[in-house]
Design a protein with these regions (language model features):
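Bacterial N-terminal signal peptides
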Residues: 7-17
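A short helix->beta-strand "capping" segment at the edge of beta-propeller domains
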Residues: 25-41
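Beta-propeller fold detector
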Residues: 33-36, 76-80, 118-122, 162-168, ...
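Beta-rich, blade/repeat-based domains predominating
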Residues: 40-51, 82-94, 125-138, 169-188, ...
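Conserved beta-strand positions in repeat-built beta-propeller and related beta-rich domains
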Residues: 55-61, 97-105, 141-147, 191-197, ...
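A short loop-to-beta-strand structural motif that recurs across blades of beta-propeller domains
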Residues: 64-66, 105-109, 149-153, 200-202, ...
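Short loop/turn segments that connect beta-strands within beta-propeller blades
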Residues: 69-73, 111-115, 155-159, 205-209, ...
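Blade-level signature of beta-propeller repeat domains, shared across WD40, Kelch, NHL, RCC1
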Residues: 310-346
């Protein structure tokens, strides 16, 4: 373990240097604070706020898990085996950290009290790169395997791993797998998965482990997704620069063009307790943190990320503080303070 203090990058006003930025000055801007991670060029990513308020994240390039204490600004690091390539983590109610060993085909369990790590290997060698995780209502972990082309369920009580192979794709320049990517749970405890190498979103029946997919507009490439309080599936279309909404009951899809247009490259995504959608446009520099209100069907917030962002890949909404946490390719951990919650949400 290694504990070090942080350098804080203060929030800056949006940089008005592009058409998107010029439009943004007419929209609400929010406060974004960033902490410089002390381990250089480590690609800190996928933060998750634990029960004690510490913000856990992984260093994908430098093979560690770490936390930021936002009260003190201190960081503490837990080294993983060289070559692990951790991609994502989640923290359970007891404070135990679970991470994906993206380059070593395992899910890891880290005990922060002792530093002890326990590894759970994938039962199929093809499931080589566990990617993104999410808890279900029973505390089990659903996860994606991007290159290996699986969706998985890790049952914590027995350490059993169940895998469902995603559909194959013909004629793609990015290989013949669907590339399961972002994953979230709905209110019925069903996982929803963005199939990034397709124009489809999938779900898995938790009882039968059968997969069903829903088609999006031609050319769409969904990368991340969130589920609102009505079980509507919202996604960012990385290829075309759209925010989309899938109604699972009908299969209907609606789309809204991103503020920065076709080259927006929307990536990291979150939803707050008012069902407002937040995502980051990574195709523009500095990256832009964008808010969309489904009640008005309008973009209402657009803020530049002071460090530039590079790429913000994943985001976490912390309801008790009404904040969104993210990691950036500029080696920072960021916190966005959201506008006050609305009243009378239907």
């Amino acid at each position: 373990m290694q504990r070090v203090p942080a350098i804080v990058i203060p929030a800056l006003a949006a940089i008005l240097a592009s058409p998107a930025a010029a439009t943004a000055q007419h929209q609400q801007q929010i406060q974004i604070d960033e902490w410089q991670v002390p381990w250089e060029q480590s690609r800190p990513r996928d933060p998750f706020v634990g029960p004690d308020g510490k913000v856990w994240f992984v260093g994908q390039r430098s093979h560690y898990a770490a936390y930021l204490d936002p009260e003190t600004g201190d960081f503490e690091k837990f080294d993983l085996d060289d070559g692990t390539g951790p991609h994502n983590l989640v923290v359970d109610g007891e404070g135990t950290v679970w991470y994906t060993g993206n380059r070593t085909r395992h899910i890891g369990r880290l005990d922060p009290e002792t530093g002890k790590i326990e590894k759970f290997l994938m039962p199929d060698d093809r499931a080589r790169d566990p990617h993104t995780m999410v808890f279900d209502q029973e505390g089990n972990i659903w996860f994606t395997v991007q290159g290996g082309n699986f969706i998985g369920k890790f049952i914590r009580g027995t350490a059993e791993v169940r895998l469902v192979e995603a559909p194959r794709v013909e004629g793609s320049r990015r290989g013949n797998g669907s590339r399961p990517y972002g994953i979230k749970m709905d209110s019925h405890d069903r996982p929803w998965i963005a199939l990034f190498n397709t124009n489809k979103i999938a779900t898995v029946n938790p009882e039968t482990m059968e997969l069903r997919s829903y088609e999006l507009p031609e050319g769409s490439r969904p990368r991340r997704l969130v589920i609102d309080s009505h079980d509507m599936v919202w996604y960012v279309d990385y290829a075309r620069g759209y925010l989309g909404r899938l109604d699972p009951a009908t299969g209907d899809v609606r789309e809204w063009a991103n503020p920065s247009g076709e080259g927006a490259r929307p990536y990291g995504m979150a939803i707050d307790s008012d069902d407002r959608i937040w995502f980051v446009e990574t195709g523009v520099q500095p990256n832009r943190f964008v808010g969309f209100d489904p009640a008005t069907e309008r973009y209402f917030s657009n803020t530049a990320i002071a460090s530039g962002g590079g790429a913000v890949r994943h985001m976490f909404f912390h309801e008790p503080t009404n904040t969104i946490w993210f990691g950036s390719d500029t080696n920072t951990i960021g916190r966005a303070k959201l506008p006050p919650r609305r009243r009378g949400i239907s």
